[in-house]
Design a protein with these regions (language model features):
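Acidic, surface-exposed loops and disordered segments
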Residues: 1-188
Length: 188
């Protein structure tokens, strides 16, 4: 088994997938990853709709002006939602669950890509959240955060380059301009 660090460095967004379906046990593993994600006060405010139907994937791909067309080519899309009546931090809860699924996908050798829905619009300027809600009969109390598309990658991207990490965005103790040593270490 590889380390978690290696998994994180290898995970990249994939927008092009092969036609191969995802095995049912892999779908279950992806959803299990979402269900074990931590939530504020253990509220489990998230809910998910898993979509494999090709026609529905095509319709979901039209949820945004730009940046959602890849959903038509994925084998599985998971709509990630949060119950706004359960907690005011449903966005954070749902985001963690989506990220867990993406890391699980990488561990399974699958590709994934996040499609933001909340605060986005369709080509005809409808709120993307309402478009998805209407399409999938999602009740009003569930906010639609994103759709994560999964599939077998058409190609594997290069891992993140550790030397290119933006350590200057890290501040120790308080916010200040940090100096980066030649070895990539942040100097206080």
């Amino acid at each position: 088994m590889e380390s978690f660090n290696e998994l994180m460095m290898r995970r990249r967004s994939s927008r092009k997938f092969t036609a191969e379906p995802i095995a049912p046990d892999q779908v279950q593993e992806l959803l299990k990853a979402a269900l074990v994600a931590p939530t504020s006060k253990n509220a489990h405010s998230w809910q998910f709709v898993a979509v494999e139907d090709r026609e529905m994937l095509e319709r979901l791909a039209a949820c945004r002006k730009m940046g959602s067309s890849f959903l038509s080519g994925c084998a599985l899309a998971v709509v990630v939602m949060g119950d706004v009546t359960v907690t005011d931090v449903w966005v954070e809860d749902a985001s963690i669950a989506a990220a867990y699924m993406q890391l699980q996908a990488e561990d399974l050798g699958l590709g994934s890509c996040w499609c933001q829905v909340r605060n986005r619009h369709t080509p005809d300027d409808t709120e993307a959240e309402q478009y998805v809600r209407d399409l999938l009969d999602i009740p009003y109390q569930l906010g639609v955060l994103c759709i994560v598309g999964f599939g077998h990658r058409e190609r594997v991207g290069r891992p993140h380059d550790e030397a290119a990490l933006l350590w200057e965005h890290v501040h120790i103790g308080c916010y200040r301009t940090a100096e980066i040593a030649g070895d990539g270490q942040v100097q206080a």
